[in-house]
A protein has these predicted regions:
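Two-component/phosphorelay signaling modules centered on CheY-like receiver
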Residues: 10-30
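Acidic di-acidic motifs
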Residues: 8-9, 125
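Hydrophobic/aromatic residues positioned on beta-strands within the core alpha/beta folds
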Residues: 80-81
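Short amphipathic alpha-helix used as the core "switch/output" element in two-component signaling
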Residues: 60-75
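Active-site residues of response regulator receiver
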Residues: 53-54
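Acidic, metal-coordinating helix/loop segments flanking the phosphotransfer/catalytic sites
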Residues: 18, 31-49
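CheY-like receiver
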Residues: 107, 114-141
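A Lys-centered signature of the CheY-like receiver
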Residues: 98
Length: 141
């Protein structure tokens, strides 16, 4: 069972994601809304995957959270944002555009888990999904 931390400033969206993930066999290690809370929860609960909103409740950016994580052994990171062209996303594996469908969030997490485990991303990719690591070996891209 993969452990996921949700970092999202919109509590309704965070609750929706938590319910969806639990229904599909994930363990949700918590919900964070700020940079400090996210980093502390990641270090304490060591999630396998992080759903990381770009804009956080404290005005910070999700990229600031990702930058604080050590590369070896860091969790897989799926950014979620309403404006994918707004900021250069770094230190993550993929990005999913908001609003997203349940099926797209689940598939996006599955792909990020595959990247962490194998270094490869296997299509099909969800609607509004973008790989962020050019070194990722994608079977059909």
């Amino acid at each position: 069972m993969l452990k996921v931390l949700i970092v999202e400033d919109d509590l309704m969206l965070a609750d929706f994601a938590e319910e969806l993930l639990v229904e599909h066999g994930y363990k949700v290690s918590g919900i964070a809304r700020t940079i400090g809370d996210a980093v502390a929860r990641i270090r304490h609960s060591t999630p396998d995957l992080v759903i990381l909103d770009l804009r956080l409740a404290d005005g910070g950016l999700g990229t600031e959270v990702a930058a604080q994580l050590a590369a070896p052994g860091r969790p897989g990171i799926l950014y979620v944002t309403g404006n994918m062209s707004q900021v250069a996303l770094t230190d993550g594996d993929a990005c999913l555009a908001k609003p997203y469908r349940s099926v797209d969030l689940l598939r996006g997490l599955q792909i990020v888990a595959e990247i962490v485990a194998t270094g490869k991303a296997q299509p099909p990719f969800p609607q509004g999904f973008q790989l962020l690591r050019p070194a990722v070996d994608s079977a059909l891209i």
